[in-house]
From Swiss-Prot:
Tissues where the protein occurs: Expressed in the inner region of the SAM, stem and leaf blade vascular tissues (at protein level).
Gene: HD3A
Species for this entry: Oryza sativa subsp. japonica (Rice)
Protein's UniProt name: Protein HEADING DATE 3A
Record's subcellular location: Cytoplasm; Nucleus
GO process terms (BP): cell differentiation; flower development; inflorescence development; regulation of flower development; regulation of timing of transition from vegetative to reproductive phase; short-day photoperiodism; short-day photoperiodism, flowering; vegetative to reproductive phase transition of meristem
């Protein structure tokens, strides 16, 4: 029997579903762009390319529908020992449908990824809100839990998600190990 479509879903293959999210059905468009580079699942972006917050465009068909955007790193501080999973890089709420994250309410400002060891997945998750709501900034960025956050604020399942891979650039300091 051939594998189901879910087997080839890049969010499943990249273990975003499981490590960060439960399986969900995408129902809204989410476009994340750093400069001229649009994020696609599993693409590689260098830390120098992601120092400034990206442009995030949200689909939907009604400006009276609001969305919450979460950006997390489930591989902090390293993929082999992710004891800070998930590290919260950005949190924006009340984004009107058909607009961009810049029209929302920034709860936690963007912090650029600076991975030191291994390849890190940086995950953008979009939730549809039931209406405008007050979201409180977490006390810290490490050990954030996207699923618990969604439950706390009654956000339900995600409506979109996309992730990219990021690793420390060669020549950016640190110890060198030669074979």
């Amino acid at each position: 029997m051939a594998g189901s479509g879910r087997d080839r879903d890049p969010l499943v293959v990249g273990r975003v579903v499981g490590d960060v999210l439960d399986a969900f059905v995408r129902s809204t468009n989410l476009k994340v762009t750093y400069g001229s580079k649009t994020v696609s699942n599993g693409c590689e972006l260098k830390p120098s390319m992601v120092t400034h917050q990206p442009r995030v465009e949200v689909g939907g068909n009604d400006m009276r529908t609001f969305y919450t955007l979460v950006m997390v790193d489930p591989d902090a501080p390293s993929p082999s020992d992710p004891n800070l999973r998930e590290y919260l890089h950005w949190l924006v709420t009340d984004i009107p449908g058909t607009t961009a994250a810049s029209f929302g309410q920034e709860v936690m400002c963007y912090e650029s990824p600076r991975p030191t060891m291994g390849i890190h997945r940086l995950v953008f998750v979009l939730f549809q809100q039931l209406g405008r709501q007050t979201v409180y900034a977490p006390g810290w960025r490490q050990n954030f839990n996207t699923k618990d956050f969604a439950e706390l604020y009654n956000l339900g399942s995600p409506v979109a998600a996309v992730y990219f891979n990021c690793q420390r650039e060669a020549g950016s300091g640190g110890r060198r190990v030669y074979p």
